[in-house]
């Protein structure tokens, strides 16, 4: 090995095993063009068949017999893919002749019949009996166990194994029937590299693969390249295709001299294999192998049915629980509480060691404390803000290299509410387990005539490995259940939002008519009360103040409803003396709250085209905010200036300091800070939210500056925009 020629697994994983350029020697191969002209033939054709098939020639009846020519004519004149087989006598031997077409090339394979017709008929009848028998199984484990026993009894192989692929493409021997003197491989695991991806594809395309003698000498196909395309002949569907020398060496290291594999294909994927091994050469006749092809299809169908039944039962149970959970959530006043039910809630929906519900700033862990790990997961998911489902079975454990690690290796998370940060998490603990590998799962470097290459391991004695850092993987069924729940909850939240919107519209109607009209009547009645009586005057003032406060609250709610429903605020800009307007608002505030110290610096003659009522609403809101949230007894500074192209109204007050989170949420409605403020128990926390909307309706904005425990709100309106007199 040198720095110039690095050695990788490419020798195995990138090996073009579908174009080996050779076949196994127990048969012969002829490839033909679409008009029947010979393109190439295996080098043993004359020795096996007694004639030469030279490129450019045509097969004759004297060479292959009338049955073969009729079969070939059928393929050459047909449309689409073609495959067929016949038996014919050539010289002293009976041959099975197998034909197929692939990529515009026609292939004829000649294989000597090694068994008499009676034996084949008996075998076929026996195979049919077993096919009928295996269909009675109701679980996969008993099916595989029974089939391995029957296959060994029928074929006489020394060992038959049922080999099932796992989620990581490694395989495990899950059933075995063997000669008593052979070591058992049952329960052993084999790495994915033992059967690389291109080999798995061929197992799907060609479900029966036979090696009659592992120690065979490959018979080359001549010429190696198709003279029509200058490409190698693709032997993917050839029954005689030569096998990878790495695979032959692998079998030799196991002590195997002959093998046959029968694929189990489920849902278009290689689910498993029946692998047959013999310690001496063994050739199974082609007609018998064709019975196994039917057997492969039947077993694949049964496994698929059983797996689908198992998954269907899991989905049935989970669907019942999911629908019950959805009903409880739909009927509950508190969605968070319905989801966080400890007994039959989300933790019972998917097999897990614990769960967590997060919604609107509230979190609840079930069967443990998972809040910190959930926070770490969300922090990682910030890199992909559009992702609504996440899963892993190897979340890192806490360490110096991974400070955001968690106690659970398995994490499955779904987001069902974006605005309220609604998430559900399922967690699985680390699963420390021992794997019994069939030999140490590695390949060794050897130097051969073609340079460095990787060779398979030489020992298949059980080698144990302790695997850490992984949980039980989340299955496709788990993910499907989680996704269905996510969609259910999203629909529930949308329906809830629609209902809230309908109620808001009704509230707007009530506030706008049924409540506002009586308030106006109360105000008018208060104004008509006699002003000569001191008691009456005080009563009138109380009634006026209370009704005015209620009207302001009603107006704020109406404004917010319009904003959140997308209607927007209406502004009617007119030429306005802003200086006079601000003085008036300051004066009204000073009268209403005599304990509030207000200092002013108002430039005279500041005019703008604004909606005076809306502008006054913003000014009053900013002063009210300063009174409620500023330090008691400290003055509030109000300034009005024209700065270039902007009219700027600033309200400054001292405060006890605000966190970054509080600053970020200043303009959000219904803030917790407003609800907890004892000096503003009647407020809704929507004044700044509406003020910002009014500023934006004037094509302006409200800036905030907070430093050294002093906060300044500045309403900025563009003069040019204002001078146009436009409205929005």
From Swiss-Prot:
| Domain Histidine kinase, residue spans | 510-721
Leader sequence range is none
Name it: Bacteriophytochrome
EC class name = transferase
Which positions, given as ranges, span the membrane?
A: none
Instruction: Please tell me where a tetrapyrrole binds in this chain.
Output: 12
Q: Does the keyword RNA-binding apply?
A: no
PTM characteristics:
Contains one covalently linked tetrapyrrole chromophore.
Q: Which family does it belong to?
A: In the N-terminal section; belongs to the phytochrome family.
- State the Gene Ontology BP annotations: detection of visible light; osmosensory signaling via phosphorelay pathway; regulation of DNA-templated transcription
> Per its database record, what is this protein's job?
Photoreceptor which exists in two forms that are reversibly interconvertible by light: the R form that absorbs maximally in the red region of the spectrum and the FR form that absorbs maximally in the far-red region.
* Span of domain GAF: 139-303
Keywords of this entry: ATP-binding, Chromophore, Kinase, Nucleotide-binding, Phosphoprotein, Photoreceptor protein, Receptor, Sensory transduction, Transferase
**In-chain residues carrying the UniProt-annotated modification Phosphohistidine:** 513
* Organism field: Pseudomonas aeruginosa (strain ATCC 15692 / DSM 22644 / CIP 104116 / JCM 14847 / LMG 12228 / 1C / PRS 101 / PAO1)
Positions of the UniProt region annotated as Chromophore binding domain? 17-495
Q: Which GO terms describe its molecular function?
A: ATP binding; identical protein binding; phosphorelay response regulator activity; phosphorelay sensor kinase activity; photoreceptor activity; protein kinase activator activity
Which EC number(s) does the record attach to this protein?
2.7.13.3
Q: Which Gene3D superfamilies match?
A: 1.10.287.130, 3.30.450.270, 3.30.450.40, Histidine kinase-like ATPase, C-terminal domain, PAS domain
Q: Which reaction does it catalyse?
A: ATP + protein L-histidine = ADP + protein N-phospho-L-histidine
């Amino acid at each position: 090995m040198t720095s110039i020629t690095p050695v990788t697994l490419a020798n195995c994983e990138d090996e073009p095993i579908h174009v080996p350029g050779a076949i196994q020697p127990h048969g012969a191969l002829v490839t033909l063009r679409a008009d029947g002209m010979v393109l190439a033939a295996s080098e043993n054709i004359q020795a096996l068949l007694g004639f030469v098939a030279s490129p450019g020639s045509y097969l004759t009846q004297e060479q292959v017999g009338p049955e073969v020519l009729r079969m070939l004519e059928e393929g050459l004149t047909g449309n689409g893919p073609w495959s067929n087989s016949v038996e014919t006598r050539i010289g002293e031997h009976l041959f099975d002749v197998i034909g197929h077409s692939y990529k515009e090339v026609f292939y004829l394979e000649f294989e000597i019949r090694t068994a008499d017709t009676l034996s084949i008929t008996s075998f076929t009848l026996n195979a049919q009996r077993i096919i009928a028998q295996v269909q009675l199984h109701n679980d996969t484990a008993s099916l595989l166990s029974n089939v391995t026993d029957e296959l060994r009894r029928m074929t006489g192989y020394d060992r038959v194994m049922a080999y099932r692929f796992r989620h990581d493409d490694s395989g495990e021997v899950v059933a075995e029937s063997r000669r008593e003197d052979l070591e058992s491989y049952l329960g052993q695991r084999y790495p994915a590299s033992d059967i690389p991806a291109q080999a798995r594809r061929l197992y799907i395309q060609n479900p029966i693969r036979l090696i009659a003698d592992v120690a065979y000498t490959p018979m080359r196909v001549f010429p190696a390249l198709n003279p029509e395309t200058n490409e190698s002949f693709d032997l993917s569907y050839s029954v005689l295709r030569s096998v990878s020398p790495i695979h032959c060496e692998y079998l030799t290291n196991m002590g195997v001299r002959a093998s046959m594999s029968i694929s189990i294909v489920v849902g278009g994927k290689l689910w498993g294999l029946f692998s047959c091994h013999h310690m001496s050469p063994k050739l199974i006749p082609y007609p018998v192998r064709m019975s196994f092809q039917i057997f492969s299809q039947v077993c694949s169908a049964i496994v698929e049915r059983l797996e689908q039944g198992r998954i269907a039962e899991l989905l049935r149970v989970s669907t019942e629980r999911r629908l019950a959970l959805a009903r409880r959530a739909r009927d509950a006043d508190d969605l968070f509480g319905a989801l966080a039910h400890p007994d039959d809630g989300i933790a019972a929906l998917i097999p897990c060691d614990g769960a967590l519900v997060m919604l609107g700033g509230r979190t609840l862990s079930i069967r443990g404390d998972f809040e910190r790990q959930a926070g770490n997961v969300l922090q990682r998911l910030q890199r992909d803000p559009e992702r609504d489902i996440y899963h892993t079975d190897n979340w890192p454990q806490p360490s110096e290299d991974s400070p955001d690690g968690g106690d659970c290796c398995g994490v499955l998370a779904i987001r069902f509410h974006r605005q309220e940060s609604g998430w559900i998490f399922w967690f699985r603990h680390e699963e420390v387990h021992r794997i019994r590998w069939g030999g140490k799962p590695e390949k060794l470097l050897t130097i051969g005539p073609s340079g460095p290459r990787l060779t398979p391991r030489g020992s298949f004695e059980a080698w144990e490995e302790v695997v850490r850092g992984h949980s039980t993987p989340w299955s496709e069924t788990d993910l499907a259940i989680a996704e269905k729940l996510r969609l259910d909850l999203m629909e529930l939240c949308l329906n809830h939002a629609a209902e809230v919107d309908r109620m808001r519209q009704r509230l707007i109607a009530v506030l706008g008519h049924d409540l506002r009209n009586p308030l106006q009547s109360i105000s008018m009645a208060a104004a008509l009360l006699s002003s000569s009586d001191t008691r009456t005057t005080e009563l009138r003032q109380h009634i006026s103040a209370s009704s005015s406060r209620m009207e302001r609250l009603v107006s704020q709610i109406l404004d917010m409803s319009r904003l959140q429903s997308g209607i927007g605020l209406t502004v009617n800009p007119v030429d306005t003396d802003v200086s006079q307007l601000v003085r008036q608002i300051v004066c009204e505030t000073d009268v209403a709250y005599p304990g509030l110290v207000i200092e002013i610096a108002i430039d005279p003659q500041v005019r703008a085209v604004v909606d005076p009522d809306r502008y006054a609403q913003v000014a009053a809101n900013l002063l009210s905010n300063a009174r409620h949230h500023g330090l008691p007894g400290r003055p509030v500074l109000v300034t009005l200036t024209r700065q270039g192209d902007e009219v700027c109204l600033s309200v400054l007050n001292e405060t006890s300091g605000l966190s970054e989170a509080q600053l970020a949420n200043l303009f959000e409605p219904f803030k917790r800070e407003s609800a907890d403020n004892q000096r503003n128990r009647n407020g809704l926390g929507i004044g700044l939210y509406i003020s910002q909307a009014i500023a934006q309706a004037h094509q302006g904005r409200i800036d905030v500056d907070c430093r050294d425990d002093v906060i300044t709100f500045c309403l900025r309106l563009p003069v040019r925009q204002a001078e146009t007199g436009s409205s929005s």
